[in-house]
Swiss-Prot record:
Disulfide bonds: none annotated. GO terms for biological process: alternative mRNA splicing, via spliceosome; cystoblast division; mRNA splice site recognition; mRNA splicing, via spliceosome; negative regulation of cell population proliferation; negative regulation of growth; oogenesis; regulation of alternative mRNA splicing, via spliceosome. Disruption phenotype: Pupal lethal; larvae are slow to develop and die shortly after pupariation, displaying melanized patches of tissue. RNAi-mediated knockdown in germ cells does not affect fertility. The third RNA recognition motif, called PUMP domain in PubMed:10606266, is atypical and may rather mediate protein-protein interactions. The lineage of its organism: Eukaryota, Metazoa, Ecdysozoa, Arthropoda, Hexapoda. SUPFAM superfamilies: RNA-binding domain, RBD (SSF54928). The gene is hfp. Expressed in all germline cells and within the follicle cell. Splicing factor that regulates oogenesis and controls both mitosis and mRNA localization in the germline by regulating mRNA splicing of a subset of genes within the ovary. Probably acts by regulating the alternative splice site selection of the otu transcript. Also regulates the alternative splicing of eIF4E1 and grk, while it is not involved in the splicing of par-1, sqd or psq. Involved in the alternative splicing of the bicistronic pre-mRNA encoding Kdm3 and CG8176; required for the efficient production of mRNA encoding Kdm3 and Kdm3-mediated regulation of rhino-dependent piRNA production. This is Poly(U)-binding-splicing factor hfp. Residues 1-20, 28-37 have a biased composition (Basic and acidic residues). Keywords: Developmental protein, Differentiation, mRNA processing, mRNA splicing, Nucleus, Oogenesis, Phosphoprotein, Repeat, RNA-binding. Belongs to the RRM half pint family. Residues 1-41 are annotated as: Disordered.
């Protein structure tokens, strides 16, 4: 009985002994149908939160070119290295913000200068549009007669009549300046050829009008987009409602505004009306011009200036400092993200690795990749002593496996002194004059490993590892290059500001005479002065006539005389007042006559023929005039 029991139990004990000798994984699979208590249970889900307890060993997988791109096999950073990475990121972002802020400031200043220049030209053009020339005036007429005849078209600002102290009479012409350009335009249209004092007067634009003709054309073209009419000679007792009730019979009116007078309930006798369509505007002009309203004949014409054309330019508003810095930071961040995406795509689009004897060398675009030995040296100072020099950009070298040593010195190697890298980080030498941004973190001092745009989880790890490895190597050269980079930044900013100021200057003849050559533009300016001048097609005639001899037939006579030497394109008669005060009536006036031919040879023949000739008892002085200055509308030479 007892022997049979022992015999029956012995096979079971052998089975248990065999099961105990099996591995845990096999034991679990063999008893899959039973509930067993295994020491290592089956993992149904992958583990994401893993803690590193040992050192990272570099195996054959480190030879892959995608290792650096995908952020694999990266060492764990110490707290000190994390601080260095944070400082590098902060410094790089500050430099990027400074550069973007400087560019924004220069662009804003350039825009302000262009706006000011445009406003000045516009104001000068509008001032010329307010003036008309009145010639062939009878010597019996006085200034009061001229004022009464031209007042119905708009308020007159000033009347400048030439006066001869010898004969005690005026010289037969005058300049009438209105407060608004529409008054001068109506006077030009309706008073030219009118009979005054037994003579038909001549009304036209001043002779210096062509130099601003381009801006004037732009203003008039802009005014055509508005269906506005100008109404003058309005009775003082009529109000805006009265004028609107009369003119709204031609069509719907958008607004009706009379110019405010000296008091609250008075007006200056003119106003503007804007219709909803062009047809109503044309009908109002045709029907209401010279219409008797309240005992005064209305003067109605189309407006030649847009609304608020005479308004003073607003002061240039500057962006608040906080807003400018925030905008610069946002711009720098976007540029960094764009760099991450472009570098990642560039790295993946390159060829496959090429095997070489002794080492594996891989071309990875133009991005510097940190070697594994350098990354290991960041964690182990002992390994940093034997770390190789940084390779040129785009070269990746596989490390030699090193057995760990308890003493901190690799086995099989003699203790060596610290080796200084023979090549500085490529980013420090590639662009020394600009803040350097690397990858997607905006670091401007050291290169980083580019990552895929979609691999958000590996961005931070890859950038941090590359920064920590290269930060130690960059410390050697950063001290020497920091001063050079600072000087380069200052030099570039100075050049940009100087170029901006040079573009904003409007050089007249007087400024060109007092010009001094300095700075980097000296060579260019000297070469420009030594270049062969362009053949001029313009001659200037001085001392040909006096201000009293200028009339409506003078231009035709000069053009007919100069036609003997070639084809005359145009003749400009310019009255230059020898004072800066435009309202000074006693200032001396010099008449300059500019004649433009179709060819330079014709201008030379005209200059040689007319120079020294006598015209009306005066000795004419004929000279060639600079073509470039003439094309710019500068007649002050």
């Amino acid at each position: 009985m007892g022997s049979n029991d022992r015999a029956s139990r012995s096979p079971r004990s052998d089975d248990q002994r065999e099961i105990s000798d099996m591995p845990a994984t096999k034991r679990t699979r063999s008893d899959s149908g039973k509930s067993t208590d295994s020491k290592i249970p089956y993992l149904s889900q992958p583990l994401y939160d893993l803690k590193q307890t040992g050192d990272v060993k570099f195996g054959p997988g480190t030879r892959s070119a995608l290792l650096g791109l995908l952020g694999g096999a990266l060492p764990k950073l110490s707290s000190e290295q994390h601080d260095l990475v944070s400082k590098a990121k902060k410094y790089a972002m500050e430099q990027s913000i400074k550069m973007v802020l400087m560019k924004q400031t220069l662009a804003h200043q350039q825009q302000q200068l262009a706006t000011q220049r445009t406003q000045v030209q516009r104001q000068q053009a509008l001032a010329l549009m307010c003036r008309v020339y009145v010639g062939s005036i009878s010597f019996e007429l006085k200034e009061d007669t001229i004022r009464v005849a031209f007042t119905p078209f708009g308020p007159i600002k000033s009347i400048n009549m030439s006066w001869d102290p010898i004969t005690q009479k005026h010289k037969g012409f005058a300049f009438v300046e209105y407060e608004i350009p529409e008054g001068a335009q109506l006077a030009l249209e309706q008073m030219n050829g009118a009979l005054m004092g037994g003579r038909n007067i001549k009304v036209g634009r001043p002779s210096n009008m062509p130099q601003a003709q381009q801006v004037i054309d732009e203003v008039q073209e802009e005014a055509k987009s508005f269906n506005r009419i100008y109404v003058a000679s309005i009775h003082p007792d009529l109000s805006e409602e009265d004028i609107k009730s009369v003119f709204e019979a031609f069509g719907p009116i958008l607004y009706c505004k009379l110019a405010q007078g000296t008091s609250l309930h008075t007006h200056k006798g003119y106003g503007f009306i804007e219709y909803a369509n062009k047809q109503a505007m044309d009908e109002a002009i045709a029907s209401m011009n010279l219409f008797d309203l309240g005992g005064q004949l209305l003067r109605v014409g189309r407006s030649i200036t847009p609304p608020n054309a005479l308004a003073c330019p607003t002061t240039n508003s500057t962006m608040p400092t906080a807003a400018a810095v925030a905008a610069a930071a946002a711009t720098a961040k976007i540029q960094a993200l764009d760099a991450v995406a472009s570098n990642a795509v560039l790295g993946l689009s390159q060829n496959t690795p090429v095997m070489a004897a002794g080492a594996v060398v891989t071309k990875v675009g133009a991005m510097p990749v940190v070697s594994a030995a350098t990354s290991a040296a960041a964690l182990h100072p002992a390994l940093a002593q034997a770390a190789p020099a940084l390779l040129p950009p785009g070269i990746f070298q596989a490390p030699t496996p090193v057995a760990p040593s308890l003493l901190g010195v690799p086995a099989g190697l003699q203790p060596l002194q610290a080796v200084v890298p023979t090549l500085p980080p490529p980013a420090l030498l590639a662009t020394p004059t600009l803040p350097m941004t690397v990858g997607g973190v905006g670091v401007g001092l050291v290169p980083t490993v580019a990552t895929l745009a979609g691999a958000e989880a590996s961005k931070g790890a890859a950038a941090a590892a590359a920064l920590s490895a290269a930060a130690n190597n960059a410390a050697v050269t950063a001290a020497n290059l920091s001063e050079n980079i600072k000087k380069a930044h200052e030099k570039q900013q100075e050049e940009l500001q100087k170029k901006l100021m040079d573009e904003g200057d409007v050089q007249t003849l007087q400024q060109q005479e007092n010009m001094s050559i300095k700075g980097q533009s000296a060579r260019q300016l000297v070469m420009q002065r030594l270049m062969r001048p362009v053949d001029s097609r313009v001659i200037i005639l001085r001392n040909m006539v006096g201000p009293e001899d200028v009339d409506e037939t003078l231009q035709e006579e000069i053009q007919e005389e100069c036609s003997k030497f070639g084809t005359v394109s145009r003749v400009i008669i310019f009255n230059e007042k020898q004072t800066e005060n435009e309202d000074d009536d006693e200032a001396e006036i010099i008449v300059k006559i500019f004649v433009e031919f179709s060819a330079g040879a014709e201008a030379m023949r005209g200059k040689e023929a007319l120079d020294g000739r006598f015209f009306g008892g005066r000795r004419v002085v004929a000279e060639l005039y600079d073509q470039g200055i003439f094309d710019q509308g500068d007649l002050s030479g």
